[in-house]
Amino acid sequence: MTTPSFEQGPIRPPSEAQSLLVRVIRNCTWNRCSFCPVYKGQRASQRALPEILADLDAMAAAADVLGGVGGSSRDMLRALQDGSVPPVAHQVALFLRGGGRHVFLQDADPCAVRPDKLVAVMQRLRERFPTIDRVTTYGRASTVARRRSEDLRSLAEAGLTRLHLGLESGSDEVLRAVCKGATAEQLVVAGRKALAAGLELCFYVMPGLGGREQSAEHVCGTAEVLRAVAPAAPTERPLVVRLRTTAVAPGTPLTERVAGGAFTLLDDVETAAELRALLDAVGDVPFELRSDHALN
């Protein structure tokens, strides 16, 4: 069993640890955020649909060899150890041990892919893995904001369940400072469009992204975006906000700002105080707050 075209992207949310990882686009279409080291030096490109479908077929074949959902752990381990299955099977094994229910589409902005192409991918997913009940992906706010509402609805109808959007900050000043390539208005539009299409929405917020210099603006702007988007979420599927505390990765432009004295990292106490201020500013607007990353 050979899989010459098989690819897997470098990252996924912690909540997708046992998800089937399907790479539909390589790297990041923006790739300029000053805090992110992940795709630096890598060019973004879209994968051809036949390549993606071949990956799905290969993963389904590996799942059959491993015994499928509910297969014997002993037999699965033996197959992985004796080399009778290809490297793709290691990732498939995690998916199966998690119940074979969740899929994550990679890399940073699959929403930049044509909607009909994504629909074709999800159709093949459902054919090959009928136990799937959740398909999620990352998306850039600027991309989602430009998408037609009917395109987002077609993705939801085809099986896309949840959109992970990098809010980071709701302050235009902070967003410009970190070269995010999105505005607060685009974040609001993207969030509301996703919810109106029937998608679950997860926003990522980065405590400390404004540094000491712009902490107040960061809190105020982020609270405004959350207050504008959260009420649009249905009660049974509230907006989820996941925290990703700002860290300085070597080789990023943010490192240079810190070294030059233009950006001062918050300490732990200041970070906690900023988060408290954010929650106070959001008020009684309903949303779920989750802290599920080692950076926190």
Regions found by a protein language model. Give the residues of each.
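Alpha-helix N-cap and loop-to-helix initiation/capping positions
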Residues: 44-47, 51, 113, 117, ...
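Canonical Radical SAM [4Fe-4S] cluster-binding loop centered on the CxxxCxxC motif
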Residues: 14-75
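Conserved SAM/AdoMet-binding glycine-rich loop
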Residues: 61-196, 284
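Conserved, mostly hydrophobic/aromatic
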Residues: 28, 36, 52, 105, ...
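Short, glycine-/aromatic-enriched active-site segment of Class I SAM-dependent methyltransferases
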Residues: 253-262
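Conserved catalytic loop of SAM-dependent methyltransferase domains
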Residues: 294-296
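Short, charged low-complexity linear segments at domain edges
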Residues: 1-21
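Conserved C-terminal portion of the radical SAM core fold
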Residues: 162, 185-254, 268-292
